[in-house]
Swiss-Prot record:
Enzymatic reactions: Hydrolysis of proteins to small peptides in the presence of ATP and magnesium. alpha-casein is the usual test substrate. In the absence of ATP, only oligopeptides shorter than five residues are hydrolyzed (such as succinyl-Leu-Tyr-|-NHMec, and Leu-Tyr-Leu-|-Tyr-Trp, in which cleavage of the -Tyr-|-Leu- and -Tyr-|-Trp bonds also occurs)
Native organism taxonomy: Bacteria, Pseudomonadati, Acidobacteriota, Terriglobia, Terriglobales
Annotated protein name in UniProt: ATP-dependent Clp protease proteolytic subunit
Top-level EC class: hydrolase
GO molecular function: ATP-dependent peptidase activity; ATPase binding; serine-type endopeptidase activity
Length: 194
């Protein structure tokens, strides 16, 4: 992946940053990939760094992600809830699956979607399991436990009844920005950067 560089003039000459480091200086974290352990570790490290720099300054987490690993996403979720700064979440493009859970878990009143955003919630996917029947049973029970946790989180952050969320995630439930606002996944739709 090609990462753009940004050149800035300083009193000591020119300084080159990769675009993500430059955004980090403005308390912006960009999640633009599927969520796996490596991506989660990078996002978490950035959040912890920004908290250490200024625990009172909001962090903006821009999300354009198809989702991914539940455990990696939950590590990001727990960090968002743990750190002192509010984490504002902004959906650009799409927030699907765990990406939608992270979008909904931003600070109350600071969860946004751009007008043409696509938000998808569904139950966790299970693929590629093989092995002994008892091992498959263990993994199946774990995926059901993770489904229960993510459903509870969506119900809490969207201010929905758990039964409604459980019904809605049985199949892919796709929303546009306005529908996501009505559902409680986001607080507002933003058209222009303020």
């Amino acid at each position: 992946m090609l990462v753009p560089m940004v050149i800035e003039q300083t009193s000591r000459g020119e300084r080159a940053y990769d675009i993500y480091s430059r955004l980090l200086r403005d308390n912006i974290i960009f999640l633009g990939t599927p969520i796996d352990d490596n991506v989660a570790n990078l996002i978490i490290a950035q959040m912890l760094f920004l908290e250490a720099e200024d625990p009172e300054k909001d962090i903006s987490l821009y999300i354009n992600s198809p989702g991914g690993s539940i455990t990696a996403g939950m590590a990001i979720y727990d960090t968002m809830q743990f750190i002192r700064p509010d984490v504002a979440t902004i959906c650009i493009g799409q927030c699907a699956s765990m990406g939608a859970t992270l979008l909904a878990s931003g600070a109350p009143g600071k969860r946004y979607a751009l007008p043409t955003s696509r938000i998808l919630i569904h139950q966790p996917l299970m693929s590629g399991l093989s092995g002994q029947a008892t091992d498959i049973d263990i993994h199946a029970r774990e995926i059901l436990r993770m489904r229960e946790i993510t459903n509870q989180l969506l119900a809490k952050h969207c201010n929905q009844r758990l039964e409604k969320v459980e019904k809605d995630v049985e199949r892919d439930f796709i929303m546009n920005a306005q529908q996501a606002k009505e559902y409680g996944l986001v607080d507002d739709i933003i058209y222009k950067h303020k």
